[in-house]
């Protein structure tokens, strides 16, 4: 059960389950299923499995089940990784972050159900779970020795790209928070057409301001990732990790902006909304890997 041969498939399983936790959370919010079990937690309407199962209750129960399963699988992965590859410097910190933020995520989710937190607190839930996902994702990359295959273990990231990337991480996280706030404030269709309601540009209420702020942050994120991508590709032509990684980040932000626009155009089509959540999850996981690479450079005296 805890042998090294289980490490690779277990890391993939943990990453996939954590991705489903992200999508499940988005699905709960988009379908208005947060109150699907009333104010009971961990029970649902006072029972382990209530007899009456409307779609909102089923969605909320499924999300809780997947979240519980993710904790079991991630704990299993962490124990195996700690035991067999704990000598790799990043493994133990990533393991602690994975479990720690998964527990915080569960507590915030439980508090939201039991005490009806306001939208600004609820918006933190998605960002917290993203940190846990990213830790598991990066741990998986390390387990599969992606570093060695793409010479990332010998990579030296110079200061300009490190600055670009730190700022990119901050901007993307702020964009994620404002996006989650849009969902929890039920502001997805506020502030009119995309990209702007040119016939009436002035926001009229809180929902309009929240939506406009998210659109502004998304634009800043797109421009900054484009600038960072151009710098990375032009200055690290010989390094596949940088070239492929930052190209993937730029592609993901294009997909993110596209699905964001389509969400408004289609009046929040559920499939497009879930793709929107998936692309930002993958983008943040990739940025987390960039951060690990930068920390290695700093640790080596760069």
Curated annotation (Swiss-Prot):
Pathway: Porphyrin-containing compound metabolism; heme A biosynthesis; heme A from heme O: step 1/1
Superkingdom assignment: Bacteria
One GO cellular component, as annotated: plasma membrane
Cofactor(s) in the UniProt record: heme b
Cytoplasmic side: 1-8, 89-93, 144-161, 237-244, 293-302
Residue numbers binding heme o: 63, 125
This protein's domain notes: The N-half (TM1-TM4) and C-half (TM5-TM8) domains are connected by an intracellular loop. Each domain is formed from four-helix bundles and they align in a pseudo twofold symmetry manner. The N-half domain is the substrate-heme O binding domain and the C-half domain is the cofactor heme B binding domain.
Role played: Catalyzes the conversion of heme O to heme A by two successive hydroxylations of the methyl group at C8. The first hydroxylation forms heme I, the second hydroxylation results in an unstable dihydroxymethyl group, which spontaneously dehydrates, resulting in the formyl group of heme A.
Family listed: Belongs to the COX15/CtaA family. Type 1 subfamily.
Protein name, UniProt field: Heme A synthase
Source organism of this protein record: Staphylococcus saprophyticus subsp. saprophyticus (strain ATCC 15305 / DSM 20229 / NCIMB 8711 / NCTC 7292 / S-41)
Encoding gene, per UniProt annotation: ctaA
């Amino acid at each position: 059960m805890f042998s090294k041969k289980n490490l690779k498939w277990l890391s993939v399983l943990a990453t996939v389950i954590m991705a489903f936790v992200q999508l499940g959370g988005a699905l709960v919010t988009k379908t208005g299923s947060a109150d699907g079990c009333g104010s009971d937690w961990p029970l649902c309407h006072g029972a382990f499995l209530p007899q009456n199962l409307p779609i909102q209750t089923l969605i909320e129960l499924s999300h809780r089940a997947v979240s519980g399963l993710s904790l079991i699988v991630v704990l299993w992965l962490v124990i195996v990784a700690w035991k067999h590859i704990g000598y790799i410097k990043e493994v133990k910190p990533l393991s602690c972050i994975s479990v720690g933020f998964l527990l915080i995520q569960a507590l915030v989710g439980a508090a939201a159900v039991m005490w009806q937190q306001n939208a600004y607190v609820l918006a933190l839930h998605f960002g917290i779970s993203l940190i846990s996902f990213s830790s598991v994702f990066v741990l998986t990359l390390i387990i599969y020795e992606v570093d060695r295959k793409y010479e990332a273990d010998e990579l030296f990231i110079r200061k300009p790209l490190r600055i670009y990337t730190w700022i990119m991480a901050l901007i993307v996280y702020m964009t994620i928070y404002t996006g989650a706030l849009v969902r929890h404030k039920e502001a997805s269709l506020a502030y009119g057409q995309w990209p702007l309601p040119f016939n009436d540009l002035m926001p009229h209420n809180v929902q309009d301001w929240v939506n406009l702020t998210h659109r502004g942050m998304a634009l800043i994120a797109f421009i900054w990732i484009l600038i960072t991508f151009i710098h990375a590709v032009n200055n690290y032509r010989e390094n596949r990790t940088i070239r492929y990684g930052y190209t993937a980040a730029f592609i993901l932000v294009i997909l993110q902006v596209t699905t964001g626009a389509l969400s408004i155009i289609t009046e929040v089509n559920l499939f497009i909304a879930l793709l929107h959540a998936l692309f930002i999850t993958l983008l943040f996981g990739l940025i987390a890997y960039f951060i690990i690479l930068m920390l290695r450079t700093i640790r080596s005296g760069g």
